[in-house]
Swiss-Prot record:
Biological source species: Mycolicibacterium smegmatis (strain ATCC 700084 / mc(2)155) (Mycobacterium smegmatis)
Chain positions recorded as Mg(2+) 2 binding sites: D279, D281
UniProt-recorded name of the protein: Glucosamine kinase
Residues given in the record as Mg(2+) 1 binding sites: Q267, D279
EC numbers on record: 2.7.1.8
Family assignment from sequence similarity: Belongs to the actinobacterial glucosamine kinase family.
GO terms, molecular function: ATP binding; glucosamine kinase activity; magnesium ion binding
One biological process term in Gene Ontology: carbohydrate metabolic process
Binding annotation for ATP: K98, E149, Y150, L151, D156
Gene3D superfamilies in alphabetical order: 3.90.1200.10
UniProt subunit comment: Monomer.
Superkingdom of source: Bacteria
Length: 399
């Protein structure tokens, strides 16, 4: 581990930027004067909250920038023990401090998006307390610390959505609960896009060309890596698939905006009767320069709609469900989500930012990315694209 930089938080606590691995590492100085990696209970997360509270607005500290909305601090640290990419500490049951233990290559999309969403009054996310970024002449700005409100008993969509779909497929009396949930999520996504409407612009011919090229490259990669049912089907129907995703090259002029960029049910938490969107880091499979670019609103809509289809696949993996009932619930969830989204967007006066034309192509591209992800990182997930690809290719609707 090589130390590149440090942010002094006072009281023998600091944040260190390292390479090999690239990480933001909280450290505490012991009584003997030696520095070590800090854990929950060592007070570094508390010190981070104090620093944000003492530096409102945007302040520079060497190569670090603090962006703070915090009007309070908190005491008492405990870990979040579920599996996650980064390391998070709950402070005083009020805030969550997330250390970026795997630094993304900059420029990072989250700081600008979160700042804009908060400034435009978007409330469909955990309330941000502050951010810390790091930038040098050799390293574009990247996110090293995120601090958000703590949401007790928050559950992500791979839990709440699977449970709701399972219940609805087993008992029609449970359908209204599913409809209410996906309606709420559709409204939140619409509110997100409305809050970013001032970033909208027409896509250029170069944008459309890059989307087509990236999609065809995804087809090639998925066809090469896929060795299961979905890979075989993709190779057999490659011409059909390329024809669908190739239409992304015809989208010059479509509105693009600073959307979420990696939206799926796993990014939507249910907490205290509300649904909130998390993780504005952009799609991790894309290079840094692509993650910060504006996207069609349909990308977020397609990501959520297709993930709802995947929820149904997961549901029947773990519970025996009548195929016809599950198919009805799957279709209802997706159409309800898209309908709620478009209705809410229109009510907010920003229907013009959404063009549904690329919805099918973007859903298909997402399934191909699932093949690649499963092949490279999580083979046990392959059952999802194995079921999703034939269903989508044979589907007669765009939702």
């Amino acid at each position: 581990m090589i130390e590149l930089d440090r942010l002094d938080l006072g009281g023998g606590r600091r944040l260190v930027i390292t390479s090999e691995p690239d990480a933001a590492v909280p450290q505490v100085r012991d009584a003997d004067g030696h520095w070590r990696r800090a854990g929950p209970g060592d007070g570094v997360a508390e010190a981070m909250l104090d620093a944000l509270n003492q530096n409102p607005g945007t302040t520079k500290h060497g190569n670090f920038t603090l962006l703070s909305w915090a009007s309070q601090t908190a005491r008492g640290e405990r870990p979040i023990t579920v599996d996650q990419t980064n390391e998070s500490v709950i402070v005083g049951d009020a805030a969550v401090v997330k250390w970026a233990t795997h630094l993304q290559e900059g420029p990072h999309p989250a700081p600008a998006r979160i700042k804009a969403l908060r400034g435009n009054g978007f409330r469909g996310m955990p309330m941000p307390w502050g951010l810390v970024t790091w930038q040098t002449a050799d390293h574009p700005e990247t996110l090293v610390v995120t601090v958000d409100e703590y949401l007790p008993d928050a559950v992500d969509g791979w839990t709440w959505a699977v449970a709701l779909v399972t219940d609805a497929a087993q008992d029609r009396a449970a359908v209204p609960a599913l409809v209410d949930a996906v309606t709420a999520v559709g409204c939140v996504v619409a509110e997100l896009h409305a809050a970013q409407a001032d970033t909208a612009r027409p896509a250029t011919a170069a944008d459309a060309r890059s989307w087509r090229e990236a999609a065809l490259e995804t087809v090639e990669t998925a066809a090469t890596l896929g060795t299961s049912v979905s890979g075989e089907l993709l190779r057999a129907r490659r011409e059909d698939v390329e024809a669908v995703v190739g239409t992304l090259g015809d989208l010059a002029g479509i509105p693009v905006l600073a959307g979420h960029g990696d939206l799926h049910v796993g990014q939507v938490l249910r907490a205290g009767g509300r649904y909130v969107v998390t993780d504005f880091d952009g799609n991790p499979v894309l290079p840094a320069e692509a993650r910060v670019k504006p996207v069609p609103a349909a990308l977020d809509v397609a990501g959520m709609a297709q993930s709802l289809a995947h929820v149904a696949i997961v549901a029947c993996k773990y519970t025996e469900l009548a195929p016809a009932a599950l198919a009805d619930v799957d279709r209802l969830a997706r159409t309800t989500f898209v309908g709620a989204y478009t209705d809410r967007l229109e009510t907010l006066g920003h229907r013009s930012v959404y063009d549904p034309a690329p919805l099918r192509a973007l859903r298909l591209q997402q399934v191909l990315r699932e093949i690649i992800y499963a092949a490279r990182h999580l083979p046990r997930w392959m059952y999802v694209p194995d079921a999703a690809l034939p269903a989508l290719l044979d589907e007669g609707t765009s939702t």
